[in-house]
């Protein structure tokens, strides 16, 4: 008799087995390992072979039509499976008492037990309405995707984190939603300076969208990407009006994960990736060519040559033998360098990250605990970034009518003081004739004719050291009381704290002309080194009370209502100081310096109060209506202009639900047209601009420098809210069992009374112009998104794409731009000249604000 022998696994296999067993044990799963190797001897366990049988069947849809390409597999053993043929039929050899799992895109999965002597099956799948029943997060609640009347995009961010490394959430949003523009202004590791715009720039002030994390305002930089489950982008006034004054530029809603009530899971993920420039511009790294071009440039403007020809010839000669040495024994590639500074500055960096989470629960409680660590080396020296994240989401249900919980997260980010902007500035001042670094010293321009302003970027970056530390803590305590089946009360309290600390100090470094060993720029003595300290702290709290009502009358009339009240307060505090003259170069603490060079500090605060509400009505999931309002008050305005009212109306018609569309339901799953109108506000200005404020300065009195106060800005107590009026028309289509989805929107929004400072005559001196409600901006555009999901050979796949077009125009500012020809008899060449009023009617430098022109148009 042939027997199956228990045998030892190789060491590597045992390691995998033990670690996997531990993970499965913690997650509450059971598993087994078997071996089919058979031997003739040894202490043995009898192997009883499983009986197998061939089963056949046909898979049909809800209308009785065969389904081609449906997956049929044995539950628990995905290696035993087949797909249905052109007639929807299948044949499969399976073990006795097996369970078949049948699946197909657009239909609910189904399980069929193989028992007794049955070998033939007629299987009918039910349509999956998940796409239409999908719940989308909206302001202060959720709605079925099919019932949305506004312009809302939803991103499954959990899927994004599985497919690619994500260092910052904001940069990862690029390309995921039509109408959302994400542009990075820096490649600094961990720096969340990605500019987000929803449907263009709606104002000349802060045009960033409102960020809401689990119902409370927050920062995308403070959240672990692995904790995010879903992100919703609210784009039109109907969707945003519930947030009133804070939502004129759109809203990004972030929902984090929660634990499952029926199991405990322990998850770990780690990733190592490498970061490097994908493409760099070609630089002038041949110094002889550079010198010739500079001489040609000087000749073109009528000045003498900059470089003597003998140095050009010398560089070309020495470059032929880079490994040779000069008379001082220095290699030619160092004494006569041809440096490519882009390659020296921008190198590759490694990123490694680790994520650990524990989640689970029961019928009384559910929880998620997570932690994340990342080390991003950056591609420029001294730009290392190390963020740490922790989170606790806990929800308890002590009774059927009461829910209590907390959503708490914290983060710390440690960064070195290296800066891309400084590196790029120094790069523009560098030349190929300087060798970067050798024998502990930084190189100096080797050619005597080189300009004195020529830099060694590495030397400039190395002269400062220090750190930057960002700490964030955010906690929300929430409760929900169900008075009746249809009526509930939510109370939320949020506390947010942010602390930023930076310390920087000078580091001794020197430059050497390597060709002859002369130290040109010596080590800075400790008495000339400086140390500085910066500290910024702010805290805020939010109180919210929400009443929710929902009821369905006569099975066709679905009514829901929301009424809420909110208070918000925020306080800022900053202090900065710098000292000079270190006692010793190794002692860089603030107390070790001898001379105070600067000190400054400030504190500010502001507060808001709001009442808001929403009413939804749906008739038979066919005719949909929604109305929102928000009444906001802000301390940033005078008491006579403090409050603003912001309403919205929207409606939708699901044409696919009409009886006359009955014949299209085999291929048309959803056809909905939408329309919305709304008004939003904006108060993103300074905290005290309606009041006269004083600033400090230094002034000379009696041959001495004295501190003084002066009026820094002209007050304007008539400031009012900016207001943005938006109109949106949209259509949503789902076809072919929800495999194909199409969504299109056409919109226009106009912002009136934009709060901006005009240019004022120099007679006002250093005074800042008063902010006024003086500008108008309009945006109009089109958005289109397409999606396809299907199954091929048991493999699910999806393809998504989107297109956006937006035009932003300045309708009113400070007068129109005029350009006229003025005759000038003294101008013998042309007889006149062009004159314009650009300095009087515009502001903004290289991207001027000019009435009648586009926003952010380069001059």
Residue ranges and their predicted role:
Residues 159, 208, 352, 387, ...:
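Extracellular/periplasmic, surface-exposed regions of secreted and cell-surface proteins
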Residues 91-93, 171, 214-241:
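Short acidic/polar hinge/loop motifs at secondary-structure boundaries
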Residues 1-54, 95, 108:
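Cleavable N-terminal targeting peptides that direct proteins into the secretory/outer-membrane pathway or into
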